[in-house]
Each structure stands twice: as structure tokens, then as C-alpha cells.
Amino acid sequence: MLTDPIADMLTRIRNATRVYKESTEVPASRFKEEILKILAREGFIKGYERVEVDGKPYLRIHLKYGPRRQGPDPRPEQVIKHIRRISRPGRRVYVGVKEIPRVRRGLGIAILSTPKGVLTDREARKLGVGGELICEVW
């Protein structure tokens, strides 16, 4: 039994980008879809789509990479360099609007679950709401 499906999704994304996969699949849920909408809007992934695998709903995540590097390592640059779960089932992390972290001084994003929906750190600050700190990405 999976105790933290969000951490599982983030781990699948992290592992797939490390081996330069084109896409990866995760079991579907509305909450995961909201997180993926933010990642796509902020440019961390190309997009996602709903698919059926053996009659079960899945989300196929299309990963994004930068241009090929020069030198001895010609692999493309990873767009997602770091993706980490912060609030977990065993240790929930809630922040008020004044405690929302700035990830990499604004180069990365924090994703929060708020009363106004799933938002980035910038959107939550703009709307003046805090919430549960789901993850950080840069």
C-alpha cells in the first residue's frame, strides 16, 4: 500500500529526468493533476495527459529538457534540477502568508495547497493566503 502518492509522483519524475526519459506515468488523481498543471504552467514539464493502463486511469507526464550541452557530456540539461516533497503524512508543514519560502531567491517554486486551491508561492503571496507546503522545485 502506498502511504504518500504525491511523494511517489515526485520520485517518478525525479528518477525519469535523471535517465532522460521522454515521459513517465503515475496513477491519476485530481490533486496530482493540479500539481502537474502548475509544473506545466511554470515550464518545468512539457505537459501531461490522462491515459488508461489496464483499465485504470493514469497521468502520462511529458518531461522537458534544455538544449544539448557542449563538451564531453553531450546530454541535454535537465529543466528539473531538484524536486522535493516537504509536507509529508507523518510531518505536515503549514505556513502562513509571511512564512512562505522563496525558493532559490525566486528561481524555483514552492507549491502550496491553500483554501483557494493549489497555488505557487508567488500566487499565494499575491492572494494573501497560506497553506500546506507540498513541495519545492527548481
From Swiss-Prot:
GO molecular function: rRNA binding; structural constituent of ribosome
Membrane-spanning segments: none
Key word RNA-binding present: yes
Pfam families: Ribosomal_S8
Entry keyword RNA-binding: yes
One GO biological process term: translation
InterPro entries: Ribosomal_uS8 (IPR000630), Ribosomal_uS8_CS (IPR047863), Ribosomal_uS8_sf (IPR035987)
Record key words, sorted: Ribonucleoprotein, Ribosomal protein, RNA-binding, rRNA-binding
Domain of life, per lineage: Bacteria
Entry's Gene Ontology cellular component terms: ribonucleoprotein complex; ribosome
Assembly and interaction partners: Part of the 30S ribosomal subunit. Contacts proteins S5 and S12.
Similarity-based family: Belongs to the universal ribosomal protein uS8 family.
Purpose: One of the primary rRNA binding proteins, it binds directly to 16S rRNA central domain where it helps coordinate assembly of the platform of the 30S subunit.
Protein name, as recorded: Small ribosomal subunit protein uS8
Designated gene of the protein: rpsH
